[in-house]
């Protein structure tokens, strides 16, 4: 990976890092949906998490686990959502893959059942 290219082309630069490893870093989301909402960002610029090689993919998800522990210790959430918007039609607005870690707190939604299933409101019921 060319560090200079990464530093000039990524919208995630110049952010305080929560944690990092050889393959990715974690930052707080600039537009958080909850206290502690964070992003895991691959150091190699790829549009999709499906473009990561196995070593990157595995180590990035190890970082997800490490950051979850940091967020739990700092913010004491009751649960977490982990999300990836992969492609424009899935809501991806930045052409650099990243993973959302969203701390959840008891009472932040009246009925949190279904979690990520609620991204398509007309299809939130379980298929019978």
Q: Which stretches of residues belong to each language-model region?
A:
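HIT superfamily nucleotide-processing domains
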Residues: 1-128
């Amino acid at each position: 990976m060319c560090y200079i290219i990464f530093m000039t082309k990524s919208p995630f630069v110049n952010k305080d890092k929560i944690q990092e490893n050889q393959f990715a870093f974690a930052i707080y989301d600039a537009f958080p949906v909850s206290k502690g909402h964070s992003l895991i960002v691959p150091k190699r610029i790829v549009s999709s998490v499906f473009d990561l090689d196995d070593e990157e993919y595995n180590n990035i998800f190890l970082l997800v686990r490490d950051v979850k522990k940091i967020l739990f210790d700092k913010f004491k959430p009751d649960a977490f959502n982990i999300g990836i918007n992969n492609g424009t039609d899935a809501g991806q607005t930045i052409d650099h893959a990243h993973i959302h870690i969203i701390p959840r707190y008891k009472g932040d939604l009246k009925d949190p059942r279904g979690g990520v299933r609620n991204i398509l409101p007309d299809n939130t019921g379980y298929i019978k």
